[in-house]
A protein has these predicted regions:
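Sequence-level detector for tyrosine residue identity
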Residues: 21, 36-37, 47, 51, ...
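Short, hydrophobic/aromatic-enriched beta-strand segments in well-ordered soluble domains
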Residues: 26-28, 176-184
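Extended, loop-rich substrate-binding clefts of extracytoplasmic carbohydrate-active enzymes
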Residues: 2-52
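Generic hydrophobic, helix-prone segments enriched in Leu/Val/Ile
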Residues: 63, 127-129, 185
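Acidic (Asp/Glu-rich), glycine- and aromatic
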Residues: 38, 42-83
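A contiguous, surface-exposed recognition patch within enzymatic or periplasmic domains that forms
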Residues: 68-176
Length: 185
């Protein structure tokens, strides 16, 4: 299952075939955002772009894939966000583990300037978020901003944050976020 933010509510969804490619457009009914998906025959990737014309609620813009953890159990940065046996003590974001460690999905973050590929893996499989340098041009926070990449709970969560509400350093930037892709290997 994938979604943008925590969902876009009632949306207008259209699908069409353009020169052999499948293009899906999702226009949010209550948010100033349009999400595009493109799939090409025999290409193991879903190409995406997000067009934003104003601030959204809740105050962050992210793509999230909730994946079957049994297929892709390995998150980004090792055990940094593996929550097995751990107990939440700060909302649902920070956990204390029986061995005394703390775990948090924030620990999987990389600076945007260095984060062009991150993903999750399993036996003979990987699922990767690929963000070329241009994908971050409209992201707020600048090149040294960072945000969540993965979290391993009941599901394996794979994120791409475009505008973060976690540590907001400037006004949001609007326009096209992307292109970016979710690649299956």
């Amino acid at each position: 299952m994938t979604h943008l933010n925590s969902g876009l509510g009632t949306s207008k969804v259209t699908a069409e075939t353009v020169n052999g490619y499948v293009k899906i457009t999702v226009v949010a009914g209550s948010q100033p955002v349009t999400q595009y998906y493109v799939a090409k025959p025999n290409d193991p990737a879903i190409y995406m772009a997000t067009y934003l014309t104003g601030e959204i609620n809740p105050g962050e813009l992210r793509f999230l894939a909730r994946l079957r953890r049994s297929a892709v159990p390995n998150g980004w940065h090792g055990d940094a966000a593996v929550l097995d046996g751990c107990t939440a003590f700060e909302g649902k974001d920070t956990f204390k583990c029986p061995n005394g460690q703390t775990r948090c999905k924030m620990y999987t973050a990389d600076r945007f300037i260095e984060d062009q590929v991150h993903g999750v893996t399993g036996k003979n499989v990987g699922i990767w978020m690929i963000m070329p340098g241009t994908a971050y041009e409209t992201s707020s926070g600048g090149p040294f901003m960072r945000d969540i990449n993965t979290q391993s709970g009941d599901d394996q969560e794979l994120y791409w944050y475009m505008n973060s509400g976690h540590v907001r350093t400037e006004d949001w930037r609007f326009g096209l976020h992307g292109p970016y892709a979710m690649q299956f290997t």
